[in-house]
Amino acid sequence: MRSLTRQSPCAKMKLECSEDQMELQTADHLVLFGCIDNRKILCQCHWICSRKESRIMMELDVENSYYGQKAKKLFLEGYNCSQSVFLAFEDKYDMDHSMAMKLSSSFGGGMGRLREVCGAVSGMFMVAGLLYGYDEPKNFEEKSEHYARIQELAGEYRERNGSIVCREILGLGKGKVDPVPSRRTKEYYQKRPCPDLVAMAAAIMEEYIRENPLEG
């Protein structure tokens, strides 16, 4: 079995995988299955040579991202995925810590553990809304601009993880959902990629802010 290596555009990491573990989904993308720190991961990468135009992704250095590592630290302290990303950016918005924590509390586990949109993504969207969102409901241009922004952020996350949906990222089925959160044990952190996912979401938001400076 021949081992193949592809360079992931996300964290500049190489994934080792055998030919039979690779699946060419479309002419545009290659999905790689690999293993990092004993965790199975999915990384969706551009199949550049088959495209005349490819979407240019952000260059991320998650390990050295201030907000990324702050979000990861919060998650390891017990905050849920949405809270971890949202609270990591507390220095960017004017909101009481308790209120910010409560506001973002419903989105953990893919919306109250429904395993829908990843909580890290929801937290990223909330930060984007506070920093760049519109406050005039009839302003069509601002609304369109903000939705485009959200879709861009979602695209950055999806390109790196194959999906923005919790159950798909974690490889879960569509069985009965349980509202009881998992105990944060050593085993939990060993099998879940969530600490790295919140770090990635926060790093994406950090890079977006760097590329799109806030006024004032």
Task: Show which residues each predicted segment covers.
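Polybasic, low-complexity association/targeting segments
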Residues: 57-77
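Amphipathic alpha-helical interface segments
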Residues: 87-91, 127, 140-216
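A short glycine/serine-rich beta->alpha loop
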Residues: 69-76, 107-115, 186-191
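Acidic-glycine-rich active-site phosphate/pyrophosphate-binding loop
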Residues: 58-61, 89-106, 175-179
